Amino acid sequence: MKITDVRVRKLTEEGKMKCIVSITFDNLFVVHDIKVIEGHNGLFIAMPSRKVGEGNFRDIAHPINAEMRQVLEDAVLQAYHEALVQWEVAAE
C-alpha cells in the first residue's frame, strides 16, 4: 500500500493539537482526521477515534504494526512541517 497524498486540512498554533491531516492510499482509500499532537517528547500522530465511554476513546482506523505506523508518522509530520513553512511565508 502506497501513500499517494497527504493533505493538511487544519493548521493551528494554539493548544497541543497542531493540525488535522487526511492521507490517501493508492489513490483509492482515504483516512481523515489524523491529528498531529505536541507531546512531552515531541510531535506524534493520533489516529481518528470515537468516544466509547466516559473519557475513553478507540481508534477507528490504525496501522497494525510499528513499521506502518512509522511510515504514516513520517509522511504526516513531513506534510505538517511543509504546511507550517508555507503558512509562515504567507504571514510575512
From Swiss-Prot:
Protein biosynthesis among keywords: no
Classification via InterPro entries: SpoVG, SpoVG_sf
Keyword annotations from UniProtKB, A to Z: Cell cycle, Cell division, Septation
GO biological process: division septum assembly; sporulation resulting in formation of a cellular spore
Keyword Cell membrane carried by entry: no
Pfam family, any one: SpoVG
Function of the protein: Could be involved in septation.
PANTHER family: SEPTATION PROTEIN SPOVG-RELATED
Family classification: Belongs to the SpoVG family.
Protein name (database record): Putative septation protein SpoVG
